[in-house]
Amino acid sequence: MDLFDFFRDWDLEQQCHYEQDRSALKKREWERRNQEVQQEEDLFSSGFDLFGEPYKTNKGDALANRVQNTLGNYDEMKDLLTNHSNQNHLVGIPKNSVPQNPNNKNEPSFFPEQKNRIIPPHQDNTHPSAPMPPPSVVILNSTLIHSNRKSKPEWSRDSHNPSTVLASQASGQPNKMQTLTQDQSQARLEDFFVYPAEQPQIGEVEESNPSAKEDSNPKSSGEDAFKEIFQSNSPEESEFAVQAPGSPLVASSLLAPSSGLSVQNFPPGLYCKTSMGQQKPTAYVRPMDGQDQAPDISPTLKPSIEFENSFGNLSFGTLLDGKPSAASSKTKLPKFTILQTSEVSLPSDPSCVEEILRESQHLTPGFTLQKWNDPTTRASTKMLEDDLKLSSDEDDLEPVKTLTTQCTATELYQAVEKAKPRNNPVNPPLATPQPPPAVQASGGSGSSSESESSSESDSDTESSTTDSESNEAPRVATPEPEPPSTNKWQLDKWLNKVTSQNKSFICGQNETPMETISLPPPIIQPMEVQMKVKTNASQVPAEPKERPLLSLIREKARPRPTQKIPETKALKHKLSTTSETVSQRTIGKKQPKKVEKNTSIDEFTWPKPNITSSTPKEKESVELHDPPRGRNKATAHKPAPRKEPRPNIPLAPEKKKYRGPGKIVPKSREFIETDSSTSDSNTDQEETLQIKVLPPCIISGGNTAKSKEICGASLTLSTLMNSSGSNNNLSISNEEPTFSPIPVMQTEMLSPLRDHENLKNLWVKIDLDLLSRVPGHNSLHAAPAKPDHKETATKPKRQTAVTAVEKPAPKGKRKHKPTEVAEKIPEKKQRLEEATTICLLPPCISPAPPHKPPNTRENNSSRRANRRKEEKLFPPPLSPLPEDPPRRRNVSGNNGPFGQDKNIAMTGQITSTKPKRNEGKFCATFKGISVNEGDTPKKASSATMTITNTAVATATVTATAIVTTTVTATATATATTTTTTTTISTITSTITTGLMDSSHLEMTSWAALPLLSSSSTNVRRPKLTFDDSVHNADYYMQEAKKLKHKADALFEKFGKAVNYADAALSFTECGNAMERDPLEAKSPYTMYSETVELLRYAMRLKNFASPLASDGDKKLAVLCYRCLSLLYLRMFKLKKDHAMKYSRSLMEYFKQNASKVAQIPSPWVGNGKNTPSPVSLNNVSPINAMGNCNNGPVTIPQRIHHMAASHVNITSNVLRGYEHWDMADKLTRENKEFFGDLDTLMGPLTQHSSMTNLVRYVRQGLCWLRIDAHLL
């Protein structure tokens, strides 16, 4: 106790010494603070919100809550810190507790030692006697902490005053407490002054020499105020003060303990208060952000940031400079955080700041200059390249002492100066507005730079700026964070993430300067930035699109080889790529490249999905599921090529130029991708070409962004331009395996260049040829088949839909084709190339009137064929129909021959577009189909061959092989048609069976389609062409949803019911696909069950049983009943095994209980009225008995009950199936002709028919119903 009192008194005396030395200055400072900060202090004491309104407005309360949770409630801290009595209590130096405090202080002192290296030696020697000096140390720490700093003078004095019981000092400190802001600035000075005084006290008792030695470095690092203190005080004292601000040594010494505690050499109470102070400083990080956002609202906080920069120096500055860097520094040394916070409070005493600034300038003029210049320089140096190079330097600098760091910082500063002239005009202005976001992103550095820029004009700001600069110099020397930054580190890390994300989204182009400013201390920041880059690399992906641009720009600006030059380059890049998000820069130069590559990969991948489907998610859309995947794979493989192409800087500029027109697009690109994959794919392909040829003008916004990403990410323009072949090869090789059958698909899925080329091919080869053929054969003689004409129009639409569905990318192509086709059809009518037609033939077979030969000879042959048809009921030739995936199932509404002509032309065109892909399928499908009747046992393939030879120009050759021979004038074709006419009905049914993939139903105009029934009556109805291609369940699900939504939008009940029935067919296909794929998550039974409900609902829309029901209603009811019957039967088959098991179990159970049941009156008969016999009660299993004995003598186990219920449900499906089938048979009798034709065309439907046959049969019937009801 005596020693403690002695030292405390001695500390007070030391305070008196320093006060005498500094009394005039302190008084001036206090007076100025009282005048300037009184209002701010009142606000603070009255509950001033640490998180300035602007900050909260921008970030919302969630961030404040999170900060409070992480760092503690500032309001609580504020009370403790701002309340003098609380401070005394926290300090725990009351006279009564003084003896205890020394002991407790030893522990806190360790933490302060961590913060302030000087303290540890002091504490080591004088922990018992150091209680007062530790408070002084605590004061420094608290001074470093804004709130701590405010209360710190009080604490120092309080710690001394309690020990010395000096009322004058105690009263003086409360006064200081009253002027918190003033006290803060003074407190800082006092911390420098009083603290040295206290330190000498501690130093005497404690070993201050080692700490003084350590402090010498921080002093040189630019803490002028401390330097003065050092000069006036023992080096030990000065060391303590300087190191607290953040000398590298102090940081290292504090590093280990800092994580443990923010405690500074405080008594136990003080220790707690220190922790609170740390929390408060942490909270100050946010006020700093608030200041940057609204300096007017929280001017004190803003200067405090400056002080933080000066005191917290490296740690706080780095944290502020870039929260990314803060994150890295945090990981490295969280200790500096508290120092930074404490510095925040001092900004309001300009004189102290100026003095410190002058001292710091003397100590480290280079750093001061750098810091002054840093606002702009930082903006320029913020470049990731600088950060990267600096990061390596900083890694060295962290362990290195201030001088070394200063040198490095000076060099960096010089580099920044070089780049600065360019960026300064742009970045500085941006820097000022940007600091708020910068503060968020980069913490104090942004605010410090901003304050520095503003501090020149404002004395308060100046002090803070000077401090920040001074701190900045040491900060550069020691990028390590303050030890108390453990909490703050979390906050900063979180803020960094938030700010980086916000910047990436909010600050497109402006963020670059902002980020530059926010990262103004790139010298120190590099390590932190690198750390943050690593941590934020995951965040960066959100901005991958822009990164490729950044990387390209950087490459372009990289002509300078030196790392310092990269800063200038970075500045240039920033200027040129202001649109790039801050996060891109934040990533850091090192990471950015990798990240950019990854990003480019991702971006490149995005364009693919977009091309593949309307939405990136849909890129695996039914038709192109495999192709998009292949393409994605290609993109995944492409990263390496991208890495290589990046070296091509000159090309990157070209990309940049191209991007320039589309820069706006990056944002819209996502929307564009989502909006339409077709447009994206087209644009991407076009973009590629445009990039090569017309990059600035043609590139579409969204597409441009994609192309940029594709080019930048996967390849630089040079690689795309120079190695476009290789790039195409890569994409082609990747895509070809997937799309090899269809170059068109490949082009769409492949890189833009390849896509563009494919587009050319599609336009020239496919469109022209197809158009010429289709009109030539189909359009001329559409008239012969009246119903056929109507259906012809409908058929092309469906076919187009089918093909489009299969090829999401062709959608865009289709968009272009329709107009071109209309224009080209007349032009190309007469051009018929047999080989081309054969190649172009799509899988879909659409019967076209055989009367449309473009040539006179063809016309004659068609006439002959027509005559023959009329005489022999020859079927019309089949022709490929246009692919329109969205409409593939909808029959075109054109009922007139003109519709047929157009449709035929369109069919030719569209077919040509998709033929490559479909050719193989079509041929295979057709070959797979065999004609079973009479002369038609020969397979479609053989017929196809014959027709191909005979019909030179018909695009329908392969599909029409059996039927279209009539079109050809050759006798062979005639013979073929003759043989096939007798079996037209069977052929058509077999063809549809083989070719129709119930998902693809397209109507073809059957000109004079003779459906040969047993009576050989002429049945002329359009027949849908079905594609045999297999799709996954998702594809059918999407189709079903489209139809269902279409039905939902209709008001006419019959049309609604028809569409619901059609949707039910798609759902049925989906269930069938689920059966094929055992990996499907959903049970096909469930799908069928839901389909049944939809059909039942559709049937309720129209009361077919009503006497007012029309034939159409009854026909629809028949089709629905057929579907229901087969669905029920199918559901039973799916559950048949379960039903068998249940049946066996139930039979066994009943056998076992037969005797018991005989003895007991049946509960069904007695209804539970009979009193159970004791025997029956005994027979009941107490465990299994689920029934109530009062209700009957027999109880059924729950297990048996469930089995019986399930068995009934399963077997009831069979009953329902037969019931509905019988109902359909009854209704069919009223429309024998309609269903006779349908059976003739599609083949009779039985209860054993497959789901595919059912779907095709019913869909064909629905098509006819639509035609009859004029719904097409």
UniProtKB/Swiss-Prot annotation:
Biased composition (Pro residues): 426-438, 844-853, 874-883
Low complexity biased stretches: 439-452
Gene (UniProt): AFF2
Compartmental location: Nucleus speckle
Function: RNA-binding protein. Might be involved in alternative splicing regulation through an interaction with G-quartet RNA structure.
Residues that bear Phosphothreonine: T478
Signal peptide (UniProt feature, chain positions): none
Protein family per UniProt: Belongs to the AF4 family.
GO biological process, alphabetically ordered: mRNA processing; regulation of RNA splicing; RNA splicing
Modification Phosphoserine occurs at: S391
Pfam families tied to this protein: AF-4, AF4_int, AFF4_CHD
GO CC terms: nuclear speck
Gene Ontology terms for molecular function: G-quadruplex RNA binding
Protein name as annotated: AF4/FMR2 family member 2
Bias-annotated ranges (Basic residues): 630-640
Disordered, as annotated region: 93-183, 200-223, 418-491, 535-687, 779-829, 842-903
UniProt biased composition (Polar residues): 97-107, 161-183, 576-586
Keywords attached to this entry: mRNA processing, mRNA splicing, Nucleus, Phosphoprotein, RNA-binding
Compositionally biased spans, kind Basic and acidic residues: 151-160, 212-223, 543-558, 616-629, 818-829
